[in-house]
């Protein structure tokens, strides 16, 4: 009986793909070796311990319908579009060895005519007249009896958009999280014009089979034809939830300040796991009472634009004479934290 398993996703949904990856990883026999090939539509994928408000331009992501997905491995933030080919290698211990999967990807690139090398922070690079350029980045996860190595190959990614979403607004964030290292990158199409996702997947698959000396039929999966994965519905619900993607952020502080015609405002937030644990308001407004009430009510509020806006607008009941000021304040807060 073969020890290999090959899965290929037809879905571009990052939450679906990451949920599939998580379920396979949890339920696979320790003797199995798995290759999972997939790709995501427009998504910023962040590491398990990263702060999305620190790493991402969340406002632009919302405007452009770009999703946020938190993965279960460590590492930095990356932008995925359909110009990225994603791979995941899984194996039980002691078979699991990330140098093996790195070798398989390098062999696949070599078979396509691209000479690449492993470098530094889990990257694969190619040499160009402008110096080394990154074509692949990876992250890893290990448990007691198994491990996985997943990463992306930059095929024909829109690199200008990558910069748009991974360069955050100059917010005054004093974060305890880590800001990712930005890397010089290149697309494989610069080296191999016309190369396709299917060709890259085929090359990785053949290198996988060649390394282990076995072949196996691919299992093609999508939301309409998922494999038998225990607890998939629960895993997908968690993967797609705000609580996981945003609420798992490290503790951080955020300062907002603005001057209105009726006075200047400073709001200070301390946020833990996506919830405001402390809020302070400072103002030279002639009537500071609404802001004082807002600071009190924001404690315990989810750090989401819609929730902050709801809390602010709820004050209209208690301060109807300050409707203009409160509506201006509400619109500003909602825009500032996106």
UniProtKB/Swiss-Prot annotation:
List the SUPFAM superfamilies: Class II aaRS and biotin synthetases, SufE/NifU
The metabolic or biological pathway listed in the UniProt record of this protein is: Protein modification; protein lipoylation via exogenous pathway; protein N(6)-(lipoyl)lysine from lipoate: step 1/2; Protein modification; protein lipoylation via exogenous pathway; protein N(6)-(lipoyl)lysine from lipoate: step 2/2
Where does the record say this protein resides?
Cytoplasm
Keywords noted in UniProt = ATP-binding, Cytoplasm, Ligase, Nucleotide-binding
As recorded in UniProt, its EC number(s) are 6.3.1.20
Q: What class of enzyme is it?
A: ligase
* Chain residues that bind (R)-lipoate: 134
Q: What is its main location?
A: cytoplasm
* InterPro entries associated with the record: aa-tRNA-synth_II/BPL/LPL, BPL_LPL_catalytic, Lipoate_ligase_A, Lipoate_protein_ligase_C, LipoylTrfase_LipoateP_Ligase
Please give the catalytic activity noted in the UniProt record: L-lysyl-[lipoyl-carrier protein] + (R)-lipoate + ATP = N(6)-[(R)-lipoyl]-L-lysyl-[lipoyl-carrier protein] + AMP + diphosphate + H(+)
The cellular component terms of Gene Ontology attached to this UniProt record, alphabetical and capped at eight, are: cytoplasm; cytosol
Q: What molecular functions are annotated in GO for this chain?
A: ATP binding; lipoate-protein ligase activity; lipoyltransferase activity
Every copy of the BPL/LPL catalytic domain together lies at 29-216
Residues that hold ATP according to the record:
71, 76-79, 134
GO biological process terms on file: protein modification process
Q: What else is known?
A: In the transfer reaction, the free carboxyl group of lipoic acid is attached via an amide linkage to the epsilon-amino group of a specific lysine residue of lipoyl domains of lipoate-dependent enzymes.
What role is this protein assigned? Catalyzes both the ATP-dependent activation of exogenously supplied lipoate to lipoyl-AMP and the transfer of the activated lipoyl onto the lipoyl domains of lipoate-dependent enzymes.
Give the record's subunit note: Monomer.
HAMAP family recorded: LplA
What family is this protein classified in?
A: Belongs to the LplA family.
- Under what name is this protein listed? Lipoate-protein ligase A
The gene name on file is: lplA
């Amino acid at each position: 009986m073969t020890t290999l398993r090959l899965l290929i996703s037809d879905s571009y949904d990052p939450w679906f793909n990451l949920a599939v990856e998580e379920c396979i990883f949890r339920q696979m026999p320790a003797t199995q070796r798995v290759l999972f090939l997939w790709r995501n539509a427009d998504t910023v994928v962040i590491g398990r311990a990263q702060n999305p408000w620190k790493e991402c331009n969340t406002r632009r992501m919302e405007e452009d319908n770009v999703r946020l997905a938190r993965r279960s491995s460590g590492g930095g933030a990356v932008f995925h579009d359909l110009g990225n080919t994603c791979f995941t290698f899984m194996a039980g211990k002691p078979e699991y060895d990330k140098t093996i999967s790195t070798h398989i990807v390098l062999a696949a690139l070599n078979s396509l005519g691209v000479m690449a090398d492993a470098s530094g922070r889990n990257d694969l690079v190619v040499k160009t007249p402008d110096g080394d350029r990154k074509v692949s980045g990876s992250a890893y996860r290990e448990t007691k009896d198994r491990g996985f190595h997943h990463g992306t190959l930059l095929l024909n990614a829109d690199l200008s958009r990558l910069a748009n979403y991974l360069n955050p607004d100059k917010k005054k964030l004093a974060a305890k999280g880590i800001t990712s290292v930005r890397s010089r990158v290149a697309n494989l199409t610069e080296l191999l014009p016309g190369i396709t996702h299917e060709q890259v997947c085929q090359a990785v698959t053949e290198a996988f089979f060649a390394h282990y000396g076995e072949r196996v039929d691919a299992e093609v999966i999508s939301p309409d034809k998922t494999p038998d994965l225990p607890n998939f519905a629960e895993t997908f619900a968690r993967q797609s939830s705000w609580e996981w993607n945003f609420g798992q952020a490290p503790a951080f502080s955020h300062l907002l300040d603005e001057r209105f015609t009726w006075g200047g405002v400073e709001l200070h937030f301390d946020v833990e796991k996506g919830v405001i644990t402390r809020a302070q308001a400072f103002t030279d407004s002639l009537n500071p009472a609404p802001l004082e009430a807002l600071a009190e009510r924001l404690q315990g509020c989810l750090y989401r634009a819609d929730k902050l806006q709801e809390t602010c607008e709820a004050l209209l009941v208690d301060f109807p004479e300050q409707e203009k000021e409160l509506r201006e304040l509400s619109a500003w807060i909602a825009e500032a934290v996106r």
